[in-house]
């Protein structure tokens, strides 16, 4: 039996080919195509992340932030 190590709220919108690692909390956000989200990341409601972004481990993206396409957050 596999236990999920991710918390993804039902109102999260995920694009195509998004990669989400373990220990991630996503709440009411929009994640663009081909974006990678590392371990121990929290993304709050109202956040919009563009296509082909990299959100590195231990990042915290607060409510209402917009991140354009092809951005790396470390």
What are the roles of these predicted feature ranges?
Residues 4, 9-10, 15-16, 21-22, ...:
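Left-handed beta-helix
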């Amino acid at each position: 039996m596999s236990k999920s190590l991710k918390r993804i709220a039902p109102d999260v919108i995920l694009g195509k080919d998004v990669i989400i690692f373990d220990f991630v909390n996503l709440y009411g956000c929009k994640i663009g195509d081909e974006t990678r989200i590392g371990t121990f990341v929290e993304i709050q409601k109202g956040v919009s992340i563009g296509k082909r972004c990299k959100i590195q481990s231990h990042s915290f993206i607060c409510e209402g932030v917009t991140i354009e396409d092809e951005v790396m957050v470390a």
